[in-house]
């Protein structure tokens, strides 16, 4: 009797893990394709800005630093693509690629001037990519690393780029505290929504499994 009662839940659990394994791999492929397209689009925008004004802020060392990060990021995306098309997808790979994305975003934001750059919005794009791998732990990792990356940018801006003495004595260069708090809270809320996507996907798979077992029982 106990085995009969436990069978639907056990089958649903197996169905979820099997579906997640396949769909997480497919999701990683989609994320990597979007990653490559996004790198090309953002770097293309940078090159257009550079062509319009060669002596502007987009030139010089800024251009060299951005190009170095883009080459490293694109190279990593190429390696990831080769691994995925060969169906090599170890469990830790999704965490490695997420941390890589957050690191590259943090570097680009630091090069662009710290937490005031609009590229901070890329953290939210990275968080929303996590549900495609169907892992709650990855959603938590993405949210946490985005917040850490933003805090690192704040520290870099205050203590290195501007200098703490100038920062705290000059209101014009400060990042408003309300902006800092709202950005971090928005990251947390984005992570919560991303987590709900994964939970709903699991409920859907388990419900289908239960319905299939019920239909088999009726037959």
Task: Please name every model-derived segment.
Residues 29-36, 100, 122, 129, ...:
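Residue-level micro-sites within transmembrane alpha helices that shape
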Residues 21, 28, 212-219:
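Short regulatory/linker helices and ligand/cofactor-binding micro-motifs at input modules
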Residues 70-72, 99-104, 118-126, 181-185:
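Membrane-embedded alpha-helical segments of multi-pass membrane proteins
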């Amino acid at each position: 009797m106990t085995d009969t009662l436990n069978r639907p839940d056990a089958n649903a659990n197996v169905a979820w893990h099997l579906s997640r394994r396949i769909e997480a791999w497919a999701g990683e492929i989609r994320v990597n394709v979007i990653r490559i397209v996004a790198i090309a689009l953002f770097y293309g925008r940078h090159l257009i800005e550079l062509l319009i004004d060669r002596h502007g802020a987009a030139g010089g060392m800024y251009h060299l630093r951005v190009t170095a990060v883009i080459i490293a990021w694109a190279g990593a995306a190429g390696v990831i693509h080769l691994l995925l098309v060969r169906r090599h997808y170890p469990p830790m790979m999704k965490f490695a690629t997420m941390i890589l994305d957050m690191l590259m975003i943090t570097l680009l934001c630091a090069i662009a001037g710290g937490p005031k750059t609009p590229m901070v919005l890329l953290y939210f794009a990275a968080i929303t990519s996590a549900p495609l791998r169907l892992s709650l732990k990855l959603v938590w990792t993405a949210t946490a690393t985005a917040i850490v990356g933003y805090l690192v940018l704040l520290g870099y801006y205050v203590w290195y780029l501007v200098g703490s003495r100038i920062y705290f004595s000059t209101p014009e260069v400060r990042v408003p505290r309300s902006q800092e708090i709202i950005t971090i809270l928005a990251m947390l809320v984005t992570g919560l929504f991303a987590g709900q996507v994964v939970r709903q996907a699991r409920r859907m798979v388990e419900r289908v499994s239960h319905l299939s077992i019920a239909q088999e029982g009726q037959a």
